[in-house]
């Protein structure tokens, strides 16, 4: 009889544990370096185009049907330069909603990041674009010279199914190497590693996140430019600043998906969807939660080719 009671007790304990433990699946989708490729047609070369946000949207809709609100759609900058459609709304029609804002709002982006070619358009253009977006454009290392405060929101917090996700945005600091100060007057661009160290401490203490995502408009082959600007330092930041689960890269137009270990031995996924909307970075984060605490976290990523998708998706 005692054995029967013991087995029953163990079953009750197991059932109790399973009732308090749940699995949460998150999907992160990333575009980068779209360069005005909103439509599947290259207006410069006057031919059909394999990339575009129109094709990306078909894939996004497919994934939203599977993940619902547990999907976050992120963009990593360099959207305001490239195809004539972007230039038209940059400098010709400066009254209407910018096509980049309109399309990204329609697609339901959750956050964006600044790229060097967005800065290239000048204050009047990128300020208007930022204001018209229904989601935050991030930039933790874009600093006002007047008061040393961030010009843009440094990070955004999302809560999905009991999981807190923080997305921290940064841009390559080498802007002064390429662009005259008249385009970014009143700003300076701080070092990415120093900025990440500062904000990671704040994020961990204030937000107590379950998942931290870095979205950096920078590649992964770090080098110093003009003797002072650390360019393409995404991998360096991932390795040297503990706390990131995922680092989303861009800027160098190179496809990349792989993991590195940070200085504490934790694995960090790095992913880069190249350019022009041909590829989307797709990240899966699966968490086992109990009483609001993370028991286990698995992160994986793939690059999805949008050439396989048409541009005629409709909302359900």
Label each residue range with its predicted role.
Residues 2-10:
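Sec-dependent signal peptide recognition
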Residues 1-2, 159:
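Short, intrinsically disordered low-complexity segments
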Residues 20-304:
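Acidic, metal/ion-coordinating pockets
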């Amino acid at each position: 009889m005692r054995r029967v009671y013991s087995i029953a007790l163990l079953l009750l304990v197991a059932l109790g544990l399973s009732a308090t433990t749940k699995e949460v699946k998150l999907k992160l989708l990333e575009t980068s370096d779209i360069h005005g490729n909103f439509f599947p047609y290259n207006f410069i070369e006057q031919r059909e185009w394999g990339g575009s946000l129109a094709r990306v949207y078909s894939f996004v809709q497919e994934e939203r049907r599977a993940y619902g609100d547990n999907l976050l759609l992120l963009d990593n900058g360099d959207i305001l330069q490239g195809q004539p459609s972007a230039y038209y709304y940059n400098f010709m029609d400066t009254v209407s909603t910018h096509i980049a804002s309109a399309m990204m709002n329609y697609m339901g982006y959750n956050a964006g990041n600044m790229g060097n070619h967005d800065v290239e358009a000048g204050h009047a253009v990128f300020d208007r674009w930022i204001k018209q977006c229904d989601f935050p454009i991030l930039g933790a290392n874009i600093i006002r010279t007047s008061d040393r405060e961030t010009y843009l929101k440094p990070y955004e917090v999302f809560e999905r199914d009991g999981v807190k996700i923080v997305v921290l945005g940064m841009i390559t600091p080498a802007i002064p190497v390429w662009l005259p100060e008249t385009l970014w007057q009143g700003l300076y661009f701080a070092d990415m590693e120093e900025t990440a160290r500062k904000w990671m401490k704040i994020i961990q203490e204030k937000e107590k996140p379950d998942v931290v995502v870095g979205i950096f408009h920078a590649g992964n082959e770090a080098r110093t430019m003009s003797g002072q600007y650390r360019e393409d330092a995404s991998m360096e930041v991932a390795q040297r600043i503990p706390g990131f689960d995922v680092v989303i890269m861009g800027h160098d137009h190179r496809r990349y998906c792989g993991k590195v270990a940070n200085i504490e031995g934790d694995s960090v996924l790095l992913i880069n969807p190249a350019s022009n909307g041909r590829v989307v970075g797709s990240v899966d984060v699966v968490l086992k939660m109990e009483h609001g605490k993370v028991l286990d976290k698995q992160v994986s990523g793939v690059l999805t080719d949008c050439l396989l998708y048409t541009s005629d998706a409709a909302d359900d």
